Amino acid sequence: MAVGKNKRLSKGKKGLKKKVVDPFTRKEWFDIKAPSTFENRNVGKTLVNKSTGLKNAADALKGRVVEVCLADLQGSEDHSFRKIKLRVDEVQGKNLLTNFHGMDFTTDKVRSMVRKWQTLIEANVTVKTSDDYVLRVFAIAFTRKQSNQVKRTSYAQSSHIRAIRKVISEILTREVQGSTLAQLTSKLIPEVINKEIENATKDIFPLQNVHIRKVKLLKQPKFDLGSLMALHGEGSGEEKGKKVSGFKDEVLETV
């Protein structure tokens, strides 16, 4: 048999190993920056493919949503059960400027609050902020024993539940409509709205564990770079040029 027709020799070339290329050589790191509303602005890093040809890395990063624990943003473990969503709106060099995109509770926190011998009350409203962000806000509350109560249970009647739900909806609507998205975020962190709901409903039925459980962003206005820069404490109109001392005197002396 001729050598050129030997199948074993012809198949030997196909067994060569291909050169392994590290996929991370085609990627680059970017720093995620949280708005100035939070104490810790350095959220972390994210990966993206490098810009090649018509594909720009900035286009792949814009709109990316990251989920961060509020305890990491505030430096306090008291907020460990709340998760904040941040959306990348602008790319500046190696920094990604983000904006608030939503909030949620961890599953274990919600389950730990649900107990027997009490009534769970939930309410949600869809409201537009003063800067045209449409949000759906979810609130949760639980009844508790009244003062000097002997009975073990603290169940609320249907009329009480409807009245409490109405008060919660009114407070949420008023607080959201009268605030910008940044102002609302600053109210959600110290739970100012929760205490207001608890005080407003104490005459109907005493409540405990009142929380804004979830905030969902439904619609956002047209992107404004100036507003985003002001949110991150950069490029505000209050910055003025520094006065150059002694410049006028030096010019007069030379003349």
Swiss-Prot record:
Superkingdom per UniProt: Eukaryota
InterPro entries the UniProt entry points to: Ribosomal_eS1, Ribosomal_eS1_CS, Ribosomal_eS1_euk
In-chain residues carrying the UniProt-annotated modification N-acetylalanine: A2
Main location: cytoplasm
Keyword list, A-Z: Acetylation, Cytoplasm, Ribonucleoprotein, Ribosomal protein
PROSITE patterns linked to this entry: RIBOSOMAL_S3AE (PS01191)
Complexes and interactors: Component of the small ribosomal subunit. Mature ribosomes consist of a small (40S) and a large (60S) subunit. The 40S subunit contains about 33 different proteins and 1 molecule of RNA (18S). The 60S subunit contains about 49 different proteins and 3 molecules of RNA (25S, 5.8S and 5S).
Family to which this protein belongs: Belongs to the eukaryotic ribosomal protein eS1 family.
Protein name: Small ribosomal subunit protein eS1
Organismal lineage: Eukaryota, Fungi, Dikarya, Ascomycota, Saccharomycotina
Gene: RPS1
